[in-house]
Design a protein with these regions (language model features):
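P-loop NTPase switch/coupling surface
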Residues: 1-144
Length: 144
C-alpha cells in the first residue's frame, strides 16, 4: 500500500507506479546470529532491536547486495568475478567482516530491482530479475 501522499500527487499515470511498488527483499537463514529473517525494504527501512539480534548483519548484507547489483549494471564487476573461487564469501562478505557468519547451512535470497542473488550450499547464483524496468540508483547508508 502506498501511503506517501506527496508521492501520489506527483504520479501522472499508472506506469509511474511501477518504480514505487517494486520492492527489494532479503531472506536470510543461518547467517551469523540470524536463524531466519525476511525483510521487505521500503523507501526508508529502520531496524530496532536488542544488541546481537542481527540488525547489523541485515544492514551489511543489504549494502553488499545493492553494491554488487550496481556494479554489475555499471559493468565495473562481472558475474563470473563474483562467483568464482567463492569470492562472494571470501572477498565481498569478508570486507564487511561477515565471512565467519556463513556455514554450510547458510541461505540468502536477495531480490533486487535488476538482479536476484541466491546463496545456497556455499555457492552464489546470480540471475537477472526480468520483472523490473530501470534501476533506481538508491543511496545506501549504514550507520552502526
Amino acid at each position: 500500500m502506498l501511503t506517501d501522499h506527496k508521492v501520489c500527487d506527483n504520479i501522472k499515470n499508472i506506469s509511474d507506479f511501477k518504480s514505487i511498488n517494486d520492492m527489494t527483499t532479503l531472506e536470510i537463514q543461518n547467517v551469523g546470529p540470524l536463524q531466519s529473517a525476511y525483510i521487505e525494504f521500503k523507501k526508508c527501512t529502520l531496524f530496532i532491536g536488542e544488541q546481537g539480534a542481527g540488525k547489523s548483519t541485515i544492514a551489511k548484507l543489504y549494502s553488499l547486495f545493492t553494491w554488487l547489483e550496481k556494479g554489475l549494471l555499471r559493468h565495473t564487476i562481472s558475474e563470473g568475478s563474483v562467483v568464482k573461487y567463492n569470492r562472494f564469501k571470501n572477498k565481498y562478505a569478508a570486507y564487511h567482516n561477515l565471512k565467519s557468519y556463513f556455514s554450510e547451512h547458510s541461505y540468502i535470497l536477495y531480490t533486487g530491482e535488476q538482479y536476484v542473488f541466491e546463496y545456497e550450499n556455499e555457492h552464489l547464483d546470480i540471475r537477472r530479475n526480468d520483472s523490473n524496468g530501470e534501476l533506481n540508483s538508491a543511496k545506501v547508508m549504514y550507520v552502526p
